[in-house]
């Protein structure tokens, strides 16, 4: 290895550099510190790095402080009261264990589930379906209504995978079952934290949903989905595929040409064969030597590229199956002391207090749904066209009986912190007064056309920011066949269904016709469907005592720009276009120090209004507002209370 030469660092002394680097100030300080140290007779007059850092930043100097010894351990707690079944309440007591308690996560295992066996229908019968639709298994020769003649129509029964089912067979099929999206979020309908009978904070599943939409970073979303039972797609690839590379010429042309305004072709002078051959060495004129150095670029060559297609598939709890295996859920609690270890509650300050976490569980019908296990297949032969056939499918969806899902391993994992006796005694003897942030939520029903305004009477205390969404009542209705998917979305959800028909054409001519007519088509049993969430708020306004804080701002400003600009890494822009954010703080969720608020306990005339083209007497909705409210926690006399209650 060669020896390095002299390295010379050249500092520019322009006006901007003098301000940014302040080299003269740095040199002056070093000289002054040396002179002072010499006057004191110090053997080493050179300044320390800490003295330099009083005026200049040293990028390569790390710092640390000694810290108070601390250890932590997760302790499992079983329910104190309540029967562990879906739809009930569970109460967990927080034991006197450790000096502080911080993080909490609920652990539950939902038992395996499946639907009951059902009899296959007899042809020509009808029956009321799962969502109020009449299901019909028509007679041959009739249309789907079983009344209008349709020549060439033949009907059979198949399962979701196209396998035939014999009509009239007993116990012939079962519906498939699947979980709603994010079942761990929906399982906890309401969570409350009480100390000595005083409710300090509570939140609903809507709050958990909004926290996920705005606050779970993308690099942790996969882990979060695993915890709350949301399936994660798996990536697959095709085999190698050969592609033609075109450069400024018409498709299927081997020479690079352009067409001018007179539709006359001329050679394109912009193509650089030598350049293209470096990036696409697979040359169609010499494919045997593809990838080798001796390929000679040919001006009129068609260059080739070999690629793979990427596909995604899922097989998790949201995928309909005949048998859903047990599902383990890990659900993080969202109280202020769970989010920030700096706000861990000193358990030693509440020695004889009763500390409880109460959880209201969702019912089974909100978590598990059925998918049709039987389909009616229509195969229609076109009269006079014996080679032409059209195949269509419709579901025969009669609700079955899903077995009762057990709820086991009901545990609350509590993160307990331990400190030395000296620090322990400090917290025992002193009164603690700390700033905390609690949830304030309001859900208000609306059915007014075009415009509505609601008083935020449930909100109080200084509010830093609000998450807002208008959720159609249809999204959580039992009549909605997609409520398992729509329950957490703040907008009207429509289905974009891929063209379900595949065509096959045979090139021959019928005897009776002058032109060939032998095109057959077949539909997918379950076509590919993409849900599209349409925001239902056009403009939003916020007023306090008649003063416009936000005056008819477009919803996209609150759903996209506000979370994009504010909050740093603590806030993300949601995928849901109907989820909105309004902030009164400069740095929402970024740091413990408050950076702005509006005190709605003083400004009681606090209204949110909006314009909408969706809401009406039939298409009703619920306004969901989740606010971060500032309060103060007072720990004294063995109890914990909020400083402000109104």
Swiss-Prot record:
Keyword Glycoprotein: no
Task of the protein: Capsid protein that self-assembles to form the pseudo-hexameric capsomers of the icosahedral capsid. The capsid is constructed of 2760 pseudo-hexameric capsomers and 12 pentameric capsomers, with a T=277 symmetry, about 200 nm in diameter. The capsid encapsulates the DNA-containing nucleoid, the core shell and the inner membrane. Plays an essential role in virion assembly. Involved in virus attachment to the host cell.
Transmembrane feature ranges: none
GO cellular component: host cell cytosol; host cell endoplasmic reticulum membrane; membrane; viral capsid
Keyword field contains rRNA-binding: no
Subcellular location as annotated: Virion; Host endoplasmic reticulum membrane; Host cytoplasm, Host cytosol
Induction notes from the record: Expressed in the late phase of the viral replicative cycle.
Oligomer status and interactors: Homotrimer. The membrane-bound form, but not the cytosolic one, assembles into large complexes. Interacts with the minor capsid proteins M1249L and p17; these interactions form a rigid zipper structure that stabilizes the capsomers.
Topology class, membrane: Peripheral membrane protein
Name under which the protein is recorded: Major capsid protein
Gene3D superfamilies reported in the protein's UniProt record: Adenovirus Type 2 Hexon, domain 4, Major capsid protein Vp54
Record-level Gene Ontology MF annotations: structural molecule activity
Keyword entries, A-Z: Capsid protein, Host cytoplasm, Host endoplasmic reticulum, Host membrane, Host-virus interaction, Late protein, Membrane, Viral attachment to host cell, Virion, Virus entry into host cell
Domain of life, per lineage: Viruses
A Gene Ontology BP annotation from the UniProt entry: virion attachment to host cell
Family according to the record: Belongs to the NCLDV major capsid protein family.
